[in-house]
Structure formats: structure tokens, C-alpha cells
Swiss-Prot record:
Enzyme class of the recorded protein, top EC level: hydrolase
Organism of origin: Arabidopsis thaliana (Mouse-ear cress)
Keywords, alphabetical: Acetylation, Hydrolase, Serine esterase
Name recorded for this polypeptide: Probable carboxylesterase 1
Active site: S163, D258, H290
Tissue expr: Expressed in roots, stems, flowers and siliques.
Taxonomy, superkingdom: Eukaryota
GO molecular function, one term: carboxylesterase activity
List of residues that carry N-acetylmethionine: M1
Record Gene3D superfamilies: alpha/beta hydrolase (3.40.50.1820)
Role this protein plays: Carboxylesterase acting on esters with varying acyl chain length.
Catalytic activity, reaction form: a carboxylic ester + H2O = an alcohol + a carboxylate + H(+)
Motif interval(s): Involved in the stabilization of the negatively charged intermediate by the formation of the oxyanion hole: 79-81
Amino acid sequence: MDSEIAFDYSPRFRIFKNGGIERLVPETFVPPSLNPENGVVSKDAVYSPEKNLSLRIYLPQNSVYETGEKKIPLLVYFHGGGFIMETAFSPIYHTFLTSAVSATDCIAVSVEYRRAPEHPIPTLYEDSWDAIQWIFTHITRSGPEDWLNKHADFSKVFLAGDSAGANIAHHMAIRVDKEKLPPENFKISGMILFHPYFLSKALIEEMEVEAMRYYERLWRIASPDSGNGVEDPWINVVGSDLTGLGCRRVLVMVAGNDVLARGGWSYVAELEKSGWIGKVKVMETKEEGHVFHLRDPDSENARRVLRNFAEFLKEETF
């Protein structure tokens, strides 16, 4: 391997000038469990055999034994990690999704996708869309996964993600409207963006902090063929047309000590004046940093994030 390092993110990974990546820490795979954790069970399902891609489904234990026709909201979640790190099966995501399902009484699907730089942008968006389409094969109750057939309420579908996963969730909500998923006039009930990874040249110049330059470099690694850099519509969503956002409600979570918070606020401002028909709200945790609720899930502020998340899912959609 070429020893010239282009980007050093020790102790997680190093990127070399020849395009190679060295992942320095073995990634931990948390297995699914049919033994309930916090009253939640989980299992994995393959959504793309040709790409060897799977996802994890979380279900409240009491729903397993439900004999009636009760359906519960469906949450589709995209993990973060700068498009490069973490997986749907990482400890922090298994812990968070288990807690989220316990708090909201929903069925959740956590999507695994191929990551950069081995698979540059836009591969992960296409993988995520494949997962959405696979999930929606269950809307007729004849899909390959019994839990989704029996328990998912497709009139109450939510998209969510943190950091890079929040970016993915946004693009999936745009594509849902553009591709016109069945049934006719279908809309996502709501979208929750935890500390979204949105950039633009203006934001970077305005902040003038090294941490923001780090996120810019990370994007260039994930999307090396982008001629527009951080003006690329994949990452500069604020500079794109938001009127086609295919959901009725949006909750944006921002953290006061997170340099990406400015992008979250800009997204909210643009959404409000875009002509999009929907409602957007913001929850700010002033004294915390990026994805603190994943790193310290037992803190009071993390619990407050989870409560707000649960309340948003339980609100009636207008």
C-alpha cells in the first residue's frame, strides 16, 4: 500500500493518496436477539442478495404475541458515521434503536449500506433507496419478512437518521415524492434528523473553524468525483429545491457545541420559506456536542432527546 497518507483519522482509519483505506479498529458486530432487551426483540433480513446487504428489524416484544390486527408505526433509520464509519450493527446503533423502539412502541428498520471510500457517493444513496423499495414490498402484506407484513402501519411511516444518516434520510424523503411510491399520493408521516451533516461553502467560510474543515475533508473523501465539492447537492441540501420533500412533518435536532448545528438551522430556515407544505420544529441542546445522545445514552440530555423523539412519533399527523 502507498505509504503517503492523505487523511489520518486515527485511531479509526487512515486514507492513502492512492485511494486505499486502512481501518485501524475492528468493527464490533452486535448480533440481533430474540431474547428481549428493554422489551424489544430484533432480527436481521437481507434486502439485496446481489449486494449482500441486510438490515435489522426491531419489534416490541408484546407485538410478537399480538393476535389481533393492531399495526404500529414504522421507523426507517439510517446510521451516521460520515458516510465512512459505523454500521447498522454497531453497539451504539443497536443500543439506540432498542431504546427508541421501547420508548415509541414502533417497529424499526435500521438500514445497512455500503460505505465510502471503498464505495464512493452516490452508492450509499442507491443502497438506501433499494432498502426503501424492499420495505415497501410489504405494504400489500405479502413481502418476504413476516414482522413487517404483520405489524407495520404503512400509514405511519417515519424516516430518521443521525449525522450522515440524517443526510440520507433527507434524500430518501425527496426521492419518495419524486418516485411516487405506492399507494397513490403517499407521504412519509414525518422525518427526524439528529444533528444532520449538511455543508456548503458559505457555511464553512462563515464558521472558519478547523472542525468544519474536517467535515469538508471527510466529504471529499466520501465523494472524490464531485467537481462541486461542498456545493454538491448531495451535501449542500440547503441550496437545493426543498418543496418536493415527501413528508408532512420534520423534527430537526441540533446541539449547541456541534459545528454542524449551523447547517441544521439553515435547513430549517430554508424549509420554512421554500413553499414546502408541512410543519418543521427544532430541538436544541445547547451544552452538548455532535451525536452526544449516542455516545452517552444514559445522560439526562440524551433521555430528553429520546422523549422528544417519542413525542414526535406519537403526535397525530395533520
